[in-house]
Amino acid sequence: MSTPPRPLALLILDGWGYSEETASNAIHAAHTPIWDTLWDRYPHTIIRASGAEVGLPNEQMGNSEVGHLNLGSGRVIYQEYTRVNRALRTGSFFTNHTLTEAVDRAVKSDKAIHILGLLSPSGIHCHEDHIHAMVELAIKRRCQEVYLHAFLDGRDTAPKSAQASILAMQAKFTELGKGRFASLIGRYYGMDRDHRWPRIQAAYNLIATGQAEYEAESAKQALAMAYERGETDEFVQATRIVPSGKAPVQVKDGDVIIFMNFRSDRARQITRAFIEPDFTGFERLYWPKLAQFVSLTEYSKEFDIPVAFPSEKPQNTFGQVLAKLGLHQLRIAETEKYAHVTFFFNGGREQPFEGEDRILIPSPQVDTYDQKPEMSAVEVTDNIVKAIESDKYDVIICNYANPDMVGHTGDFNATVKAIETIDQCLGRVWAALQSAGGELIITADHGNAEKMYNAQYQQPHTAHTHNAVPFIFVSERAAIASANGSLADVTPTMLYLMNIKPPPEMSEHRLIELSSP
C-alpha cells in the first residue's frame, strides 16, 4: 500500500453550519472565493452535529464541547446533559450520594445551601430543569435555607428571554413553599473562561458577600431594571435580590455550594475563586470556609471537590491512536477554543499525548468579538503555515473560533467579516499544504453563523443551531464522499486516509472512499 500524503490537516470552523436558507445567513452573505472553490472542486458532504447523533437529547443543538468530544473520540459520546436527564427520569437524581450527602451536611449543621447555575432552557452549559430538581432535593431533605444564585443566558438563547425561566423558577419556589432567588448576574461575568478576572470578581463578590451594583425585591424586578438599563440577559450586571423585610444573602462559613453547570469550560474560573486557598485571580476580600463545594460534573482534575456525576473517559481516541504509533500531531487554536482542540478533543484528558505539541494563540482582549471579528485567526494561520513547512507533523488539528464567537454577538456585519477572514486563512493553509504535498479536511463542530436572526422573537439570533455542518476533503487523490454521517465519523475517516485501521471503539462509517487509481 502506498504511503499516504502528509501532513493531514483538520480545520474545525467553529460555528460554521450548513443551511440553504439565505436570509440572515452570514456565511451566504460573505465573499468566500476560497471556500466556494474548495466546495465545488473537491469531495464534500454534510454531517450531523446535534441531537442524538452526538449524544444529546433529540432536537438539542450541538455545542463546541460536545462537538470536539465526538470528533476526537471518533464515536458518539453520551453527554453529561443526557446522563443527568436520565437520572431525573429514573428518579436516581434524588438519591445521588454526592448531592444528598451535601444537603444532609447542611441540614445537620443548620446551614444554607447555595445553588449556582445558568438558569436557561438551552442545555448547553446547564438546564433549568436540573436546577429545579436540585432545589426540590434540598427542600424535601428539610434544608431550611435554599438560595439560588442565577446566571442568565442570552447567548445560547434569545438575548431577552430570561423572564420565562425566572417565572418558572419562582413558581417552583412557591410550589415547594421554601427557597428563593439570592442574586442575578449575566453569564458574561459569572461564566468567563478567558481569565478576565474582573468579570469573575463581580460574580464572586455578589454571591459570596452580597455586594452588588444593584438591588431588587424580586428576580422579575431585577430583570426589568436590567432591560431598562439597556442590558440583555448575558450582560445583566450584579443584582442582589432582597425581598422586603429580608437581609442580603451572603455565603457563610459552614454553608454548602452546589454548582449545577454540567459543562466544565465556563465553570472553572469561578469555582477556583471559591475553592483554592492560594487563588490569585483577584483579591478576595472575604473567603467563606465552606462545608463543601459540589460540582455536578468534573470541571478539572486539579479540583479536589465532590462530583455528582463523574466523567466517563473514552479510550483509544484519535490522539491516543496517533501517539501509540509514534506519530507527531499539532493542536492549535486561540484562547477561546484552545480547550476544545486539546482537553475535549482528547476525550477529557488534560495532558498532551506523546508526540503531541500544542500552540495557544491569545484571543484579543475586547469586550465582545464584534469589535474585532478577525480575532486571532491570522496569527493562528501564521503558525499553521510554519508547522506545515517544518515537515514535523503527520497531523495538524486547528480550530478557528471566529464564526462561533462573533456569531454569538448577533452582529450580522461583523459575522460576515469573520467569515471572510476565515476564507482568506483557508487560502493560505491550502496553498501551504499544496506545496508540502499534504491533504486537508474542513468541517465544523456545530452551526451558528448561518442563522443570525430569530424571527420568532424578532431579535438577533445569538445561539447555536440544529443544522448539519459541512465536510470537505481537499486532496488530489480520487475520492467520493458518502452521506448519512456525523461528527463521530470524521477521525475514523482520517485514520482510513492515513492507512491506519481505526480501533474497534470507533465508528465504522467512512465519510470518504478512495477510488482505485
UniProtKB/Swiss-Prot annotation:
Annotated active site: 64
Pfam families, alphabetized: iPGM_N (PF06415), Metalloenzyme (PF01676)
UniProt cofactor note: Binds 2 manganese ions per subunit.
Class in the EC hierarchy, top level: isomerase
EC number(s) reported in the record: 5.4.2.12
Gene Ontology molecular function terms on file: manganese ion binding; phosphoglycerate mutase activity
Keyword Isomerase: yes
Reactions catalysed, as given in the entry: (2R)-2-phosphoglycerate = (2R)-3-phosphoglycerate
List of residues binding Mn(2+) 2: 14, 64, 445-446
GO cellular component terms listed in the entry, alphabetical order: cytosol
Record InterPro entries: Alkaline_phosphatase_core_sf (IPR017850), BPG-indep_PGM_N (IPR011258), Metalloenzyme (IPR006124), PGAM_B_sf (IPR036646), Pgm_bpd_ind (IPR005995)
Pathway where it operates: Carbohydrate degradation; glycolysis; pyruvate from D-glyceraldehyde 3-phosphate: step 3/5
SUPFAM superfamilies: 2,3-Bisphosphoglycerate-independent phosphoglycerate mutase, substrate-binding domain (SSF64158), Alkaline phosphatase-like (SSF53649)
Cofactor: Mn(2+)
Sites where the protein binds substrate: 125, 155-156, 187, 193, 263-266, 337
Sequence positions that bind Mn(2+) 1: 404, 408, 464
Keyword Nucleotidyltransferase in record: no
Gene Ontology BP terms: glucose catabolic process; glycolytic process
Keywords: Glycolysis, Isomerase, Manganese, Metal-binding
Family statement: Belongs to the BPG-independent phosphoglycerate mutase family.
Protein purpose: Catalyzes the interconversion of 2-phosphoglycerate and 3-phosphoglycerate.
Subunit structure: Monomer.
UniProt name for this protein: 2,3-bisphosphoglycerate-independent phosphoglycerate mutase
